[in-house]
């Protein structure tokens, strides 16, 4: 299966498919960003194992939901051939909805151009591992045009043997700022243990910002000096 999200360099059409031939009555709603980092939404109907193309160019995929649960995995991806409903080029996959689930929020999110986000808390839950092991969660931020930086590292011990771990870290006294066009990402790593299931939830305060273009009138130096001279005569 795919492990990382590879961003497109420019907006492109998305495709959807299922790994089960019987998934033909469900629809896939995709929320993401276009080349201008504006929010766009598109709904595409599934046709089982066959890939179905959308009509809008997506630069980013932030959220995917289904109209009803499916019997197979649902893939959202850029152009790729498929085999039994699975994209042949997994680097094109932007999101996967697991069998029986209704949604798939990636552990990565690009902020729209007219928004600022403030991370106030994170909650993590894990279970299903066969042995105890250390878990490390890393929260990274990538500013527009810059490299990724790690803002917070969370370490805890999963006890394994079907134990359930539930923890929360609060940033409400000093929220972490994610400006427009920046990327929020969570990565998880572990030492030992197998078959762990990890859930992660981030809480944000959203701030709308004004992105209306403004016009500035510029005059040359000679005209500016003449205008100042005229003002001087008027004042005298």
PLM regions: where:
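Beta-strand-centric surfaces of beta-sandwich/beta-rich domains
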Residues: 1-60, 67-235
């Amino acid at each position: 299966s795919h492990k990382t999200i590879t961003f497109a360099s420019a907006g492109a059409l998305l495709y959807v498919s299922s790994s089960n031939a019987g998934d033909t009555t469900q629809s896939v709603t995709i929320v993401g960003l276009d080349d201008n980092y504006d929010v766009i939404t598109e709904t595409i109907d599934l046709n089982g194992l066959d890939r179905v193309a959308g009509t809008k160019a997506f630069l980013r995929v932030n959220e995917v939901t289904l109209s009803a649960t499916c019997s197979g995995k649902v893939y959202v991806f850029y152009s790729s051939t498929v085999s039994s409903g699975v994209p042949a080029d997994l680097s094109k996959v932007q999101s996967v909805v697991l069998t029986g689930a209704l949604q798939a929020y990636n552990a990565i999110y690009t902020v729209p151009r007219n928004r600022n986000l403030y991370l106030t808390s994170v909650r993590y839950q894990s279970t299903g591992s066969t042995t105890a092991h250390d878990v490390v969660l890393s929260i990274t931020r990538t500013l527009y045009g810059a490299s990724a930086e790690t803002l917070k590292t969370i370490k805890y011990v999963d006890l394994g043997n079907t134990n359930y771990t539930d923890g929360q870290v609060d940033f409400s006294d000093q929220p972490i700022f994610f400006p427009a066009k920046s990327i929020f990402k969570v990565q998880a790593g572990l030492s030992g243990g197998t078959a762990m299931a990890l859930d992660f939830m981030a809480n944000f305060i959203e701030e709308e910002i004004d992105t209306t273009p403004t016009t500035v009138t510029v005059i040359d130096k000679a005209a500016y000096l003449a205008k100042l001279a005229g003002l001087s005569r008027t004042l005298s």
